[in-house]
Amino acid sequence: EKYPDIVVCGTVGPCHDPSADYIEGWRFAKENSRYIDMVDEHYYESPGWFLNNQDYYDGYDRKAPKVYLGEWASRTRTMESALVEAMHLCHIEKNADVVVMTSYAPLLCKEKHHNWNPNMIYFDNTNITLTPSYHTQKLFSVNGGDRYVASTLRVPEGLENRVAASVVTDSKSGKKYVKLVNALPSALKLNVNGLDISGNTAIEGFRGMPADKAVQPAD
């Protein structure tokens, strides 16, 4: 009460549901929600986990403390991980009323001197290597908005978890951001209905094969 500007962040352990730390941490946070503003979640998972959990935050209690996803990543330093991480960020933007902050971790690692993999940026005495995951984080960091626009993707049956999208707008600039992630082995044709994207339109992105450790600019 004396320091209303202080935000109290609790912890729910190093793993996601259904770990014991996660369950007990959330129980404590909800019971003490008067004092706990948000909780810090951590998880590192396989690309397959991210593909199959694109609804992870949909069922979260909107009245509970918020989520700071303080450490997270897919477990390889490849294009595949960059794609599934982008899918997860699309899902997080959809649930921005629950997940208020995210931070990829770890960030920096010297080649051949690491005790954790993956990291976002690798370096040695002369070179810097940016992983595909770096490019995902960069795109989302500079193409944000303050309003999420509900959208629907229509893709062939059985392929729903291989494609993701997020649409956000910026109320100050009037800009609209349509984010599309395609983890299929073929290109997609995109038709945008219900959103005026005429006028000045710019395309940013990258592409590559699943095992690639470097990216190519989008055509």
PLM regions with names:
Residues 4, 11-16, 41-44, 72-75, ...:
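An acidic- and aromatic-residue-enriched active-site/binding cleft used to recognize and process polar
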